[in-house]
Curated annotation (Swiss-Prot):
Belongs to the ATP phosphoribosyltransferase family. Long subfamily. GO terms for cellular component: cytoplasm. This is ATP phosphoribosyltransferase. Its cofactor is Mg(2+). Pfam families: HisG, HisG_C. Feedback inhibited by histidine. Its main location: cytoplasm. Its EC number is 2.4.2.17. PANTHER family: ATP PHOSPHORIBOSYLTRANSFERASE, ATP PHOSPHORIBOSYLTRANSFERASE ATP-PRTASE. It is found in: Cytoplasm. Catalyzes the condensation of ATP and 5-phosphoribose 1-diphosphate to form N'-(5'-phosphoribosyl)-ATP (PR-ATP). Has a crucial role in the pathway because the rate of histidine biosynthesis seems to be controlled primarily by regulation of HisG enzymatic activity. It comes from Campylobacter jejuni (strain RM1221). The gene is hisG. Disulfide bonds: none annotated. Pathway: Amino-acid biosynthesis; L-histidine biosynthesis; L-histidine from 5-phospho-alpha-D-ribose 1-diphosphate: step 1/9.
């Protein structure tokens, strides 16, 4: 580790959150050189060290105050929190921001040939999972007795290998379940990536840097959700055209050279503009419609 004056951020070394975590930091202006085998990357323009670790280790690094910030899936965070609590500890952290990537769900799944009516169908079954604490909490809340089978990977093969009757695993598209002759029957937890901070107070300098990063994260996320729209519109149809566009702020209206009937409208839309909306705009007389991505945005 470098000197403690540098902000330490833990991210997943490899896996589904790794690439998008690096992209987020880069879009926030954190310049760094990532080497595949290196566990630490040093920012070249900000006093920040990026620690690349297993995702299961990130919550503990935050709970124990080893790192200052972490980007982690809510499922891993809460599983580790419940595990610490089961050992009599009281882990703490600050949730700074839920992020716009890493979406998945933790679901119960059964073999395709099994009939499913309700959760009582899981009574007494042996369930394989990598998230025993989240599963235990859900089953307890629903009054279901079951047998736990904790696996650290390849959970979906457990029924076929006669290790378990059912599974509780992460699902994104469902393709892996189908490939293993399983069907998703109940979502027990919805998850996405989040940015967390250790509970202990940071130095004044570090906190100022965190505040700056949070402002940039908000700007990046807002830019991803927004589009810059430019079009020409008849003056008499402005109200109808604006009603079709969900804007962040009031649009900018500009005169067109040598055209008394039409104006140019520029605005930031907070939603993606679908073809149906563009067609509706055209029906109201709009023309020269341009929809552009926004790289950065600060309100």
């Amino acid at each position: 580790m470098q000197e403690n004056t540098r902000l330490r951020i833990a991210i997943q070394k490899s896996g589904r959150l790794s690439k998008e975590s690096i992209e987020l930091l880069s879009e926030c202006g954190v310049k760094m050189h990532i080497h595949e085998q290196s566990l630490i990357a040093f920012s070249t323009n900000l006093p920040i060290d990026i620690l690349r670790v297993r995702d299961d280790d990130i919550p503990g690094l935050i709970f124990d105050g080893v790192v200052d910030l972490g980007i982690i899936g809510e499922n891993v965070l809460e599983e580790n929190e419940l595990e610490r609590q089961s050992l009599g500890e009281n882990p703490s952290y600050k949730l700074l921001k839920k992020l716009d990537f890493g979406y998945c769900r933790l679901s119960l799944a059964l073999p395709q040939e099994n009939k499913f009516q309700n959760l009582k169908d899981f009574e007494g079954l042996r369930i394989a999972t990598s998230y025993p604490q989240l599963l235990k909490r859900f089953m307890k809340e629903n009054g279901i007795n079951y047998k736990n089978c904790t696996l650290t990977g390849s959970v979906e093969v457990a029924p076929r290998a006669n290790l378990a009757d059912a599974i509780c695993d992460l699902v994104s598209s469902g393709a892996t379940l189908q490939a293993n002759n399983l069907k998703e029957v109940k979502v027990i937890y919805e998850s996405r990536a989040c940015l967390i901070q250790k509970e202990n107070a940071l130095s004044k300098e570090k906190q100022a840097l965190v505040d700056k990063i949070m402002l940039r994260v908000a700007g990046v996320m807002q830019a991803r959700e927004s589009k810059y729209i430019m079009l020409h519109a008849p003056k008499e149809k402005l109200d109808k055209i604006q009603a079709l566009l969900p804007g962040v702020e009031r649009p900018t209206i500009l005169p067109l050279a040598h055209d008394e009937k039409n104006v140019a409208l520029h605005m930031v839309s907070k939603e993606n503009l679908f073809w149906e909306t563009m067609e509706a705009l055209k029906e109201e007389g709009a023309s020269s419609i341009l929809v552009l991505p926004i790289e950065k945005m600060l309100k």
